[in-house]
UniProtKB/Swiss-Prot annotation:
This is Nicotinate-nucleotide--dimethylbenzimidazole phosphoribosyltransferase. The lineage of its organism: Bacteria, Pseudomonadati, Pseudomonadota, Alphaproteobacteria, Rhodobacterales. Belongs to the CobT family. GO terms for molecular function: nicotinate-nucleotide-dimethylbenzimidazole phosphoribosyltransferase activity. The active site is at E306 (proton acceptor). Pfam families: DBI_PRT (PF02277). Gene3D superfamilies: 1.10.1610.10, 3.40.50.10210. Pathway: Nucleoside biosynthesis; alpha-ribazole biosynthesis; alpha-ribazole from 5,6-dimethylbenzimidazole: step 1/2. Keywords: Cobalamin biosynthesis, Glycosyltransferase, Transferase. HAMAP family: CobT.
Length: 338
């Protein structure tokens, strides 16, 4: 679907009339769940997940058949500041690896039965160093938001967004600090594996960016423009498109959560259609999830990004949906006690 906005004002307008969850589907799923051949509440959180999914799909007996994983790749000017354990050219190399089927995300998509798309966002033109100037112009931000919006498959019934971009945990840390408050050190973690003096340098870069753009950081979209990256903006655009289309979303790690947090800062109901797939080993991720009110499904010590933790959670949600829709009721099974 072509993005319905050509400016930041147009993107903001998207959030003025967001569709609501289908209350009738929630009611139907809840009623069905209470008649299934199990003690009440015996499936724990799976029951809540299935009812949540039913409400956004709009079907009291839903199916999960067409999950989409949308990966966005972008390069960052701050990568030249040595904030990552890997050089900037790795972004392009990893995109080639995705297309060849050789990355972890490819294997996990296969296991989860998910389609996978990869969107490259001007990899030959990194964003600007946000310690010197805004990372993006308004036009560049709008283009990235639109690219994310248009990458969403309208036929999908679940969306996961992932990212590739050397330096993007630095941008994510800066976004989180700007949106949530606190110091650069509180939000800056090891990312690709930096430690010691390299981690100190990364933290300084985040602090410099916050100081440089302090006057603009009361506006969430200005936070994204000044401190973010094209792939982070594209993730925000994709999550927004899913919200408008009432497509459920599983959020991934710290970078994805920072992108989602921009939407949450615009209006908290922007993330009603989203759950957190996991909590990553990136130290600030638990705090970021708490700030947007999301409880993770998994804690596996993952810190790869690229959507991987959320993809692992797809089959948990699929299991929940299968139980709601496929189990027999007490009456159907001829089992007493229902």
């Amino acid at each position: 679907m072509k993005a319905p906005f050509t400016s930041l004002a147009g993107f903001r307008a998207v959030f003025e009339t967001l569709p609501q969850v289908d209350a009738e589907a929630v009611e139907a799923a809840t009623a069905r769940n209470e008649t299934l051949t199990k003690p009440k509440g015996a499936l724990g959180r799976l029951e809540d997940l299935a009812i949540w999914y039913a409400g956004w799909i709009g079907d009291g007996r839903p199916a999960l058949e067409r999950p989409q994983v949308a990966i966005f790749a972008g390069n960052h000017g701050i990568a030249a500041r040595g904030v990552s354990a890997f050089p900037p050219e790795v972004t392009v190399q990893m995109v080639a690896n995705y297309r060849a089927g050789g990355a972890a995300v490819n294997q996990l998509c296969h296991v989860a039965g998910a389609s996978m798309t990869v969107t490259e966002l001007e990899l030959d033109r990194p964003t600007l160093d946000f310690t010197v100037s805004p990372a993006m112009t308004e036009d560049e931000l709008v283009a990235a938001l639109a690219a994310g919006w248009e990458a969403v498959d309208d036929e999908s019934d679940l969306l996961v967004v992932g990212e590739m971009g050397i330096g993007n945990t630095t941008a994510a840390a800066a976004i989180a600090a700007a949106l949530f408050g606190g110091t650069a050190a509180e939000w800056t973690g090891r990312g690709s594996g930096v430690a010691g003096s390299a981690l100190e340098a990364k933290t300084r870069v985040v602090a410099e960016g916050l100081e440089r753009h302090g006057d603009a950081l009361s506006d969430p979209l200005e936070v994204l423009r000044c401190l973010g990256g094209r792939e982070i903006a594209a993730m925000a655009g994709a999550i927004a498109r899913a919200r408008v289309g009432r497509t459920p979303v599983i959020l991934d790690g710290f970078i994805c959560t920072s992108a989602a947090a921009v939407l949450h800062a615009l209006t908290p109901s922007a993330l009603d259609h989203a759950i957190a797939g996991h909590v990553s080993a990136e130290g600030a991720h638990p705090a970021a999830l708490a700030r947007i009110g999301k409880e993770p499904l998994l804690d596996l010590g993952m810190r790869l990004g690229e959507g991987t933790g959320a993809i692992v959670a797809i089959n948990i949600l699929r299991s929940a949906v299968a139980c709601l829709s496929g189990m027999a009721t007490f009456a159907e099974a001829g089992v007493s006690g229902g």
